[in-house]
């Protein structure tokens, strides 16, 4: 079965009404760029988050000739507050009249930033928005409770925020992935298979330069730092479990801790025409969902199910899926839920290889989705992210023929 949009005008007349939310039919994605992804304390170890984001933002504005968008909307997960998106925009030299604000949905921040930007354009509040995200785990601020407050006497500094009532541990996300493996009866062999696949496809993309058109080089970086071309089963078998009483989670089947930035340009049809821009895709819609915060990895798949149901689509209608594989258990859940789509999933590998710069990851996989659709000459694509605290976000877009 071909995607509904492959049938042209007749399909649009039949299905078009289900894609109209406000004037979402009017939201176009012109293009975007991402940095190379660095590992924590790696090639960007001396680069603050706002400077890394600014370096990519400046290149996006220059490449797509958008000197003064209506908004800058940027995701960031581990900053210390203070609307770091505004600081980043000012660092990039954006006109002070352009408002910028930060989205914090943790891992889903970058994708939710794109969804919010699309909604603003759809409802007529804006004509052009640059959206995405940025993160520096290397320079992540330390946070702590007020030592002078009687309720927090003796509390230590922390780096991982509190995601659910009554639980505040540095290992809470790892514990959630471990629990997901237990509940879903996932085997080590299944996890290993996805780790090897991710690194193999990422290494192939790196060697072939498949993603070179979406890279914004900065600060001397020349490649994605986390990809391991020689990842092997032998290496996976030697890795210890990261949790004291864990059975599944290792350093390989959970994502790296990373630095990176990515932004896309969204605009209306009128802005596109007025400024002589060419769209790569049309944003058709998005959803968010909630789930058990103890097993947040599942929400990436739940969000996709909700997205497809909302727009009356099935997996066979989608030409490429890109999911932020923060843990290999997410891949296993995807394959079990959408068994016909394994061959059209994370075409260039995923976060197990590239890493996961929290605030940027949603924008990164959106850019990878565009490149995958271009390569396969597909029409419809989905991006999805599971976020800490049990939140899932998913986006549906249609590639526009050049």
Model feature map: region roles:
Residues 178, 284-353:
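Active-site pocket-lining segment
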Residues 76-127, 167-172, 233-256, 337-365, ...:
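Conserved catalytic cysteine-centered active-site region
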Residues 105-135, 181-211, 264-270, 357-378, ...:
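Active-site-proximal alpha-helical scaffold in enzymes
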Residues 34-61, 78-79, 101-115, 127, ...:
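Active-site pocket-shaping loop/turn-to-helix segments
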Residues 19-49, 182, 234-297, 302, ...:
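Condensing-enzyme catalytic core mediating Claisen C-C bond formation in acyl metabolism
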Residues 34, 46-55, 63, 190-274, ...:
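N-terminal extracellular/periplasmic Venus flytrap/periplasmic-binding protein-like
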Residues 45-108, 112-121, 125-128, 134-153, ...:
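Conserved beta-ketoacyl condensing-enzyme motif
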């Amino acid at each position: 079965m071909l995607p509904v949009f492959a049938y042209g005008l007749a399909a649009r007349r039949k299905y078009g009404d289900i894609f109209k939310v406000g004037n979402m039919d009017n939201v176009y994605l012109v293009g975007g760029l991402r940095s190379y992804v660095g590992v924590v304390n790696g090639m960007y170890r001396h680069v603050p988050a706002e400077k890394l984001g600014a370096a990519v933002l400046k290149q996006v504005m220059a490449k797509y000739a958008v000197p003064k968008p209506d908004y800058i909307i940027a995701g960031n997960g581990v900053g210390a507050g203070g609307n770091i998106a505004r600081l980043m925009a000012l660092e990039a030299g954006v006109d002070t009249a352009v408002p910028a604000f930060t989205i914090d949905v943790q891992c889903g921040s970058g994708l939710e930033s794109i969804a919010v930007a699309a909604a603003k354009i759809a409802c007529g509040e804006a004509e052009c928005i640059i959206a995405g995200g940025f993160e520096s785990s290397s320079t992540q601020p330390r946070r702590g409770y007020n030592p002078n407050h009687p309720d927090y006497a003796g509390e230590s500094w922390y780096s991982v925020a509190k995601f659910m009532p009554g639980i505040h541990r540095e290992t809470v996300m790892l514990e959630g992935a471990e629990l997901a493996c237990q509940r879903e009866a996932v085997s080590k062999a299944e996890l290993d298979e996805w780790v090897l696949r991710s690194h193999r496809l990422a290494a192939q993309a790196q060697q072939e330069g498949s993603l070179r058109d979406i890279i914004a080089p900065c600060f001397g970086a020349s490649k994605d730092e986390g990809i391991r071309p020689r990842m092997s089963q032998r290496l996976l078998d030697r890795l210890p479990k990261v949790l004291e009483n864990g059975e599944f989670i290792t350093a390989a089947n959970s994502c790296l801790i990373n630095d990176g930035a990515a932004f896309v340009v969204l605009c209306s049809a009128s802005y596109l025409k007025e400024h002589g821009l060419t769209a790569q895709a049309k944003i058709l819609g998005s959803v968010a969902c909630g789930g058990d915060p103890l097993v947040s990895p599942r929400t990436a798949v739940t969000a996709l199910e909700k997205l497809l149901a909302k727009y009356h689509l099935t997996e066979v209608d989608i030409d490429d899926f890109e999911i932020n594989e923060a843990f290999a258990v997410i891949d296993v859940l995807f394959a079990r839920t959408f068994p016909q789509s394994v061959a059209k999933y994370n075409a260039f590998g995923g976060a197990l290889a590239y890493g996961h710069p929290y605030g940027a990851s949603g924008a990164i996989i959106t850019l990878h989705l565009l490149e995958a659709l271009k390569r396969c000459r597909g029409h419809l694509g989905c991006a999805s992210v599971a976020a800490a605290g049990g939140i899932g976000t998913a986006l549906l877009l249609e590639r526009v023929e050049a």
